Amino acid sequence: MAIDEDKQKAISLAIKQIDKVFGKGALVRLGDKQVEKIDAISTGSLGLDLALGIGGVPKGRIIEIYGPESSGKTTLSLHIIAECQKNGGVCAFIDAEHALDVHYAKRLGVDTQNLLVSQPDTGEQALEILETITRSGGIDLVVVDSVAALTPKAEIDGDMGDQHVGLQARLMSHALRKITGVLHKMNTTLIFINQIRMKIGMMGYGSPETTTGGNALKFYASVRIDIRRIASLKQNEQHIGNRAKAKVVKNKVAPPFREAEFDIMFGEGISKEGEIIDYGVKLDIVDKSGAWLSYQDKKLGQGRENAKALLKEDKALADEITLKIKESIGSNEEIMPLPDEPLEEME
């Protein structure tokens, strides 16, 4: 139905007035504005990139990665930093926990020489630094580790045992209100690492778990990823890593509730080669005969770990199989589930 001519004139006049006050583009007709594709930063995990629906975490948005201790939250965040840097991005790490392992970050592929790092004393200081570097327009990705460690100044200055109810939640709510629009305008991705707490007095239905920092982050985050350790990886009775499951519990840019599983190897991080084998076998791109794994006419190795070692050495072959996996799954199809049974002994 056509819009009344008088209404069109009135709204056009209003748009001109708004442009004068707030700048051109403050109010636009959606039909006049080209819809831009959402850019993404790879997570370093083939399965998680597929689960997120756009090939990684979206740029210009707030992301929350949460889970129990030692589940792989920081490892995943460092992989995202490494992938961003590979494409020329500038990254910052706000280490509120004062626990960043620089040597481990380097082993995951992070360019530590060019990584901006801050170890703030208070939550207010951390969030002020975050706002300043975001408004500069020169940063592509900021990781805050973690929300639980963003301690309000009043709590630090107070005595042990003092009650500071809701201080951190108010701090987070205020910061997110200020920073969300700036992140979108500057196309900066912000990742909050968060911890899990048990709800006090929780009875009956519903999950007894919750995340720290109040409810604001749950609302402002475009993507929330729940990561858990589900098994230990062993080789010759030695623990060599963990199996992790990541579930996209909220996603504003693609369908939510998709899951991905991947190996996190001690000292190495996410095993891309392990995912290539898992998805390759599931999609019949990699052949599995007994313990032997092969691709076309080439033997990859006897056992999953040997095949992973070969793919780690032969990057060209790994890239070739990865491309075939992506083509097989397709960008518009549902994520393929991982094999029901692990290819290597886990506990």
Curated annotation (Swiss-Prot):
GO terms for cellular component: cytosol. SUPFAM superfamilies: P-loop containing nucleoside triphosphate hydrolases, RecA protein, C-terminal domain. PROSITE patterns: RECA_1, RECA_2, RECA_3. Pfam families: RecA, RecA_C. One of its GO terms (molecular function) is ATP hydrolysis activity. The keyword Cell cycle does not apply. Its main location: cytoplasm. It is found in: Cytoplasm. The keyword Nucleotide-binding applies. Can catalyze the hydrolysis of ATP in the presence of single-stranded DNA, the ATP-dependent uptake of single-stranded DNA by duplex DNA, and the ATP-dependent hybridization of homologous single-stranded DNAs. It interacts with LexA causing its activation and leading to its autocatalytic cleavage. This is Protein RecA.
